[in-house]
Regions:
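Proteins enriched for Cys/Gly/acidic motifs involved in redox and nucleic-acid/cofactor modification
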Residues: 1-208, 247, 258, 262, ...
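Generic beta-strand/beta-sheet core signal
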Residues: 7, 79, 201-203, 237-239, ...
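Short glycine-enriched, charge-decorated loop/helix-capping segments at active-site entrances
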Residues: 48-49, 172-173, 212-215, 275-281, ...
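Conserved SAM/AdoMet-binding glycine-rich loop
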Residues: 76-80, 85, 192-316, 326
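Conserved, mostly hydrophobic/aromatic
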Residues: 163, 183, 200, 236, ...
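Structural beta-strand/beta-sheet cores of well-ordered domains, especially the beta-sheet scaffolds
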Residues: 196, 232-237, 260-262, 300, ...
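Extended hydrophobic-aromatic, low-complexity segments
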Residues: 260-261, 274-275, 286, 298-301, ...
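Terminal RNA-binding accessory module
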Residues: 348-452
Length: 452
């Protein structure tokens, strides 16, 4: 049996693309392995978002190329966002690669995977992502790469936002939504496979359905998914601040299975920087938005990300962002130093910030957020919270772990469980009640008080 090794880098949206490619291959008789050294064909699905991601992608491709040079692998395929940005350069610099698949060519994996197919006969599909049409649907095969109790569901592809720092529109094409019925059908299929948590992802989730002429489509979708038998939690990631509707918030407040969690990258709070970023808004408008979110959805956890060191960011801009973080007290925050990406409007801006300054600002922001997170977590001591049980902890075989609804996998903390009543060890994916006994910077610790 032909064996394909998959290496998927980058975000959950890219992971879904990998799952689809693996699904096509498995459906056509290929064996899938996570061990590239044991494969006939190696597929590296790359990320091309920022410098660190590009470097990781290049290093991974070179490691895979060495497998081919050593005779362990017969074919090397490179896919994903890096291909959209640097296909010609990759082709020239890494001749070991047999085929390149862009983000609009996911279904072409079968045409290039077979080591018996002559490399010279492989199809060449030109890049043209402004006319990109690719969307998977409920009939598309997938091999889930996540733990069995949760799955990412891509509800849209592409982005039309003009953010000055971002190359994603050029890599992923224009914004386009999946059909409502297709997403619902896929949710039912995933529930039948034992998935308990659906995590809705897109480059711009809050715009879902606009291109289909549907109003409040995300709210309607979230409500419908919350009624799928077998699904316990539905989570929405990657929303945009100007598209947080009252209808969407009301569903979060009313539907028990719609988790009270809002992932909403804000990027900055200074009007000066937001204008340079081509995002608009100011601190006051963002504070009003957060106040509205918390008022309409009591108990909601708000997660956001910021960029430090954007060109033109002054010390006053930085101090305003710091003050904003202190004032709002987000539940989760990620801060990234600005990455100067060729081909973006920000690349041509003057007043570039030195990397050490951007790093200093990032570290200061994260240090302040750590204090906020620790204080909020300590305030939960004594609470009994609903936790999705995820099995043995990654930190110690003496601990179990799970997540509250306010914790997304991989990017947020977890609940470490140090005591399970005798005879009632839950199954992975079960919901259990955990009494919190300790609160730390990112994680909480507790014991199971009841199961079921």
């Amino acid at each position: 049996m032909k064996k394909v090794g998959f290496i998927s880098l980058g975000c959950p949206k890219n992971l879904v693309d990998s799952e689809v490619m693996m699904g096509h291959l498995k459906q056509n008789g290929y064996q899938i392995t996570a061990d590239a050294a044991d494969a006939d064909t190696v597929v590296v699905n790359t990320c091309g978002f920022i410098d660190s991601a590009k470097k990781e992608s290049i290093d991974t491709i070179l490691e895979a190329a060495q497998l081919k040079t050593n005779g362990q692998a017969k074919r090397l395929i490179v896919a994903g966002c890096l291909v959209e940005r640097y296909r010609d350069e990759l082709k020239a610099e890494i001749p070991e690669v047999d085929a390149f698949i862009g983000t609009n060519q996911i279904n072409d994996i079968l045409a290039v995977a077979d080591p018996k197919v002559n490399t010279r006969s492989l199809p060449v599909v030109p890049i043209g992502n402004q006319s990109a049409t690719y969307l998977y649907d409920e009939s598309t095969p997938r091999v889930l790469a996540t733990p069995s109790h949760y799955a990412f569901v891509k509800i849209a592809e592409g982005c039309d936002r003009p953010c000055a720092f971002c190359f994603i529109p050029q890599m992923r094409g224009h914004f386009r939504s999946r059909r409502f019925g297709s997403i619902i059908a896929e949710a039912h299929q995933l529930a039948e496979e034992g998935v308990k948590e659906l995590i809705l992802v897109a480059q711009d989730s809050s715009r879902y359905g606009e291109d289909l002429g549907k109003q409040d489509a995300l709210a309607r979708l979230l409500r419908e998914l919350s009624h799928v038998d077998g699904i316990e939690w539905v989570r929405v990631m990657y929303t945009y601040p100007t598209h947080i509707s009252d209808a969407f918030l009301d569903v979060l407040a009313a539907e028990p299975k719609a988790v009270k969690y809002l992932d909403m990258p804000l990027q900055h709070a200074s009007q000066n920087v937001l204008k340079l970023m081509k995002r608009g808004g100011n601190r006051q408008s963002l504070e009003q938005l957060i106040e509205r979110v918390r008022r309409r959805v009591p108990g909601i956890a708000v997660r956001t990300t910021f960029i430090s060191g954007f060109p033109g960011e002054t010390e006053d801009d930085f101090e305003e962002l710091m003050s904003f973080i202190k004032s709002v007290e987000f539940d989760r925050v990620g801060v990234f130093t600005y990455s100067d990406e060729e081909g973006t409007p920000a690349f041509d801006l003057s007043d570039k910030i030195q990397h050490r300054t951007a790093t200093r600002r990032r570290n200061a922001l994260m240090k302040e957020q750590a204090k906020i997170s620790r204080r909020k977590n300590k305030a939960r001591v004594g609470d009994v919270v609903r936790v999705l049980f995820e099995g043995e902890s990654n930190e110690s075989e003496l601990l179990w772990q799970g997540r509250m609804e306010t914790q997304a996998p991989d990017i947020d903390g977890c609940v470490l469980i140090n005591d399970v009543p005798e005879g009632i060890v839950p199954a992975v994916g079960d919901l259990v009640n955990v009494k919190i006994t300790e609160g730390h910077e990112y994680d909480l610790i507790g014991h199971i008080s009841s199961h079921g």
